[in-house]
Design a protein with these regions (language model features):
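Extended, low-complexity, turn-rich repeat/linker tracts enriched in Gly/Pro/Ser/Thr and Asp/Glu
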Residues: 79-82, 117-118
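Solvent-exposed beta-hairpin/edge-strand motifs
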Residues: 65-77
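Short, surface-exposed beta-strand/strand-loop-strand elements in extracellular ectodomains
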Residues: 85-91
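Generic structural motif
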Residues: 27-29, 72, 100-102
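Surface-exposed interaction regions enriched in Ser/Thr/Asp/Glu
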Residues: 91-133
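Extracellular receptor-binding modules and their adjoining Ser/Thr/Gly/Asp/Asn-rich linkers
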Residues: 2-13, 18-68, 117-133
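Intrinsically disordered, low-complexity regions enriched in Ser/Pro/Gly/Gln/His and often acidic
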Residues: 27-29, 77, 95
Length: 133
Protein backbone atom coordinates (compact mmCIF):
# COMPACT_ATOMS: atom_id res chain seq x y z
CA UNK A 1 0.00 0.00 0.00
CA UNK A 2 1.38 3.38 -0.97
CA UNK A 3 1.88 5.95 1.77
CA UNK A 4 -0.01 9.24 1.31
CA UNK A 5 2.12 12.38 1.33
CA UNK A 6 0.37 15.72 1.75
CA UNK A 7 2.14 18.98 1.01
CA UNK A 8 0.87 22.18 2.69
CA UNK A 9 1.38 25.84 1.91
CA UNK A 10 2.09 28.41 4.65
CA UNK A 11 -1.62 28.63 5.55
CA UNK A 12 -1.88 24.87 6.03
CA UNK A 13 -3.89 24.34 2.84
CA UNK A 14 -3.29 21.12 0.90
CA UNK A 15 -1.28 21.88 -2.24
CA UNK A 16 -0.91 18.50 -3.90
CA UNK A 17 -1.66 15.17 -2.26
CA UNK A 18 0.21 12.31 -3.87
CA UNK A 19 1.49 8.89 -2.99
CA UNK A 20 5.06 7.78 -2.45
CA UNK A 21 4.71 5.43 -5.46
CA UNK A 22 3.97 8.49 -7.65
CA UNK A 23 7.42 9.81 -6.77
CA UNK A 24 9.32 6.58 -7.53
CA UNK A 25 10.69 6.30 -11.05
CA UNK A 26 12.19 3.23 -12.70
CA UNK A 27 13.05 1.93 -16.14
CA UNK A 28 11.20 -1.21 -15.04
CA UNK A 29 7.42 -1.52 -14.96
CA UNK A 30 5.89 -0.39 -11.66
CA UNK A 31 2.41 -0.91 -10.21
CA UNK A 32 1.46 2.61 -9.02
CA UNK A 33 -1.10 1.33 -6.51
CA UNK A 34 -3.74 3.42 -8.31
CA UNK A 35 -6.69 2.32 -10.44
CA UNK A 36 -8.12 3.71 -13.67
CA UNK A 37 -11.82 4.63 -14.06
CA UNK A 38 -12.56 1.08 -15.27
CA UNK A 39 -11.02 -0.41 -12.10
CA UNK A 40 -7.84 -1.67 -13.80
CA UNK A 41 -4.46 -1.20 -12.11
CA UNK A 42 -2.33 1.68 -13.39
CA UNK A 43 1.32 0.90 -14.11
CA UNK A 44 4.13 3.24 -15.10
CA UNK A 45 7.50 3.04 -16.77
CA UNK A 46 10.21 5.64 -17.39
CA UNK A 47 12.16 5.66 -20.66
CA UNK A 48 15.45 7.45 -21.31
CA UNK A 49 14.46 8.60 -24.80
CA UNK A 50 17.87 10.09 -25.57
CA UNK A 51 18.30 12.85 -28.15
CA UNK A 52 15.23 14.26 -29.87
CA UNK A 53 15.08 13.95 -33.67
CA UNK A 54 16.28 16.38 -36.33
CA UNK A 55 13.02 17.59 -37.96
CA UNK A 56 11.78 14.03 -38.20
CA UNK A 57 10.32 11.17 -36.15
CA UNK A 58 12.22 8.97 -33.71
CA UNK A 59 10.84 5.73 -32.22
CA UNK A 60 12.12 3.99 -29.09
CA UNK A 61 10.88 0.54 -28.04
CA UNK A 62 9.52 0.64 -24.49
CA UNK A 63 9.39 -3.12 -23.84
CA UNK A 64 5.97 -3.20 -22.16
CA UNK A 65 3.63 -6.04 -23.13
CA UNK A 66 -0.17 -6.12 -23.03
CA UNK A 67 -0.92 -2.38 -22.86
CA UNK A 68 -4.68 -1.79 -22.85
CA UNK A 69 -4.70 2.02 -22.55
CA UNK A 70 -2.16 4.78 -21.98
CA UNK A 71 -3.65 7.19 -19.42
CA UNK A 72 -0.88 9.77 -19.03
CA UNK A 73 2.43 10.81 -20.61
CA UNK A 74 4.86 13.22 -18.98
CA UNK A 75 8.55 13.83 -18.57
CA UNK A 76 11.36 16.33 -18.92
CA UNK A 77 13.46 17.75 -21.74
CA UNK A 78 17.08 18.62 -21.06
CA UNK A 79 18.61 21.71 -22.69
CA UNK A 80 22.15 20.79 -21.69
CA UNK A 81 23.57 19.92 -18.30
CA UNK A 82 21.65 22.41 -16.15
CA UNK A 83 18.46 23.53 -17.92
CA UNK A 84 15.26 21.44 -17.96
CA UNK A 85 11.62 21.86 -18.97
CA UNK A 86 8.47 19.81 -18.44
CA UNK A 87 6.83 17.72 -21.10
CA UNK A 88 4.53 18.86 -22.48
CA UNK A 89 6.77 21.79 -23.27
CA UNK A 90 4.78 24.93 -22.56
CA UNK A 91 6.09 27.88 -24.54
CA UNK A 92 4.53 31.27 -25.20
CA UNK A 93 4.93 32.10 -28.85
CA UNK A 94 4.44 30.69 -32.31
CA UNK A 95 8.01 29.60 -33.08
CA UNK A 96 7.76 25.89 -33.86
CA UNK A 97 11.41 25.42 -32.87
CA UNK A 98 10.11 24.43 -29.43
CA UNK A 99 7.54 21.93 -30.70
CA UNK A 100 8.06 18.28 -29.84
CA UNK A 101 5.19 15.80 -30.00
CA UNK A 102 5.32 12.60 -27.93
CA UNK A 103 3.06 9.58 -28.38
CA UNK A 104 3.05 6.12 -26.83
CA UNK A 105 1.81 3.08 -28.75
CA UNK A 106 1.56 -0.50 -27.57
CA UNK A 107 5.21 -1.02 -28.55
CA UNK A 108 7.04 2.31 -28.81
CA UNK A 109 7.46 5.90 -27.67
CA UNK A 110 7.38 8.27 -30.68
CA UNK A 111 8.72 11.80 -30.87
CA UNK A 112 8.17 14.13 -33.84
CA UNK A 113 9.85 17.51 -34.26
CA UNK A 114 9.44 20.17 -36.94
CA UNK A 115 12.98 21.54 -36.50
CA UNK A 116 16.35 20.13 -35.46
CA UNK A 117 16.02 19.37 -31.74
CA UNK A 118 18.86 16.82 -31.61
CA UNK A 119 20.67 19.02 -29.07
CA UNK A 120 17.87 18.20 -26.57
CA UNK A 121 17.24 14.93 -24.76
CA UNK A 122 14.16 13.58 -22.98
CA UNK A 123 13.10 11.31 -20.15
CA UNK A 124 9.51 10.10 -20.62
CA UNK A 125 7.26 8.48 -18.02
CA UNK A 126 4.02 6.93 -19.20
CA UNK A 127 1.15 5.47 -17.20
CA UNK A 128 -1.01 2.65 -18.57
CA UNK A 129 -3.41 -0.19 -17.89
CA UNK A 130 -2.90 -3.76 -19.08
CA UNK A 131 -5.07 -6.22 -20.97
CA UNK A 132 -4.06 -8.96 -18.52
CA UNK A 133 -5.65 -7.34 -15.42
Amino acid sequence: MAKLVTLHDTDGEVIYPQTISDMDYSTSEQDTGCKWIDGKKIYKKTIDFGALPNASIKNVDHGVANIARVVKIDGIISFGSNNWSNIPLVYQGVDSIYNAEFQVTTTQVHCATSKDRSNLSAIITFYYTKTTD
